[in-house]
Amino acid sequence: ILFPYVEDEKEALSAVESTRYPPKGIRGVMSAARMNKYGTVTDYYKKADDEICVIVQCESKKAIQNISKIAAVEGVDGIFIGPSDLSASIGKIGQFEDEEVQSLISLGLENCKKSNIPAGILTAKRDFAKKYVADGFTYVAINSDTNLIARSAENLLKEFK
């Protein structure tokens, strides 16, 4: 489960707790729901806590500076750095190539490595994707589904105009 805009360890703990059943968390219990085959999986609640993957998005300068504390929260399985909101948080909206934005991304990755936690990032640019892989990001999302669909539709439309 991906949690957006987590800035500190308190918010990270809240995210984790919302995915865990009592007594480890506050997730609501529904005995006859699809996730446990409508009540037929007898040990579902015992297994569920261990099978959830919690990834928090660090999308501000404050979050980048707090990554070590966020990563230390038990149950946080990964960090995803969000360049769009990160650039906006420092008054440079949409300026992903800006030196300060890239410096914060590098700091975030460095803090993830020091904390031994997987780090991910999103970019629409191939050269940045290659750079992020080379830098050591665990996973790199290249572009978005909506952008890919829109560009494909534009190219198809050009073909028939």
State where each predicted segment sits.
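Hydrophobic faces of well-ordered beta-strands that scaffold small-molecule active sites
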Residues: I1-F3, V54-E59, A71, I79-I81, ...
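Glycine-rich phosphate-binding active-site loops on the catalytic face of alpha/beta enzymes
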Residues: L2-A15, I79-I90, F137-L156
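Conserved anion-binding
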Residues: F3-E74, A88
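Non-membrane alpha-helical structural segments and their capping/turn regions in soluble enzymes
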Residues: E9, D98-S106, R126, A150
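Alpha-helix-loop-beta-strand connector modules within alpha/beta enzyme cores
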Residues: E17-G25, K47-D49, E97-G120, F160
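Glycine-enriched alpha-helix->loop->beta-strand junction motifs that scaffold or abut catalytic
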Residues: T19-Y21, V73-G78, A134-V140
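Histidine/lysine/aspartate-rich catalytic loop segments that bind and position anionic ligands
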Residues: K61, E74-K92, E97
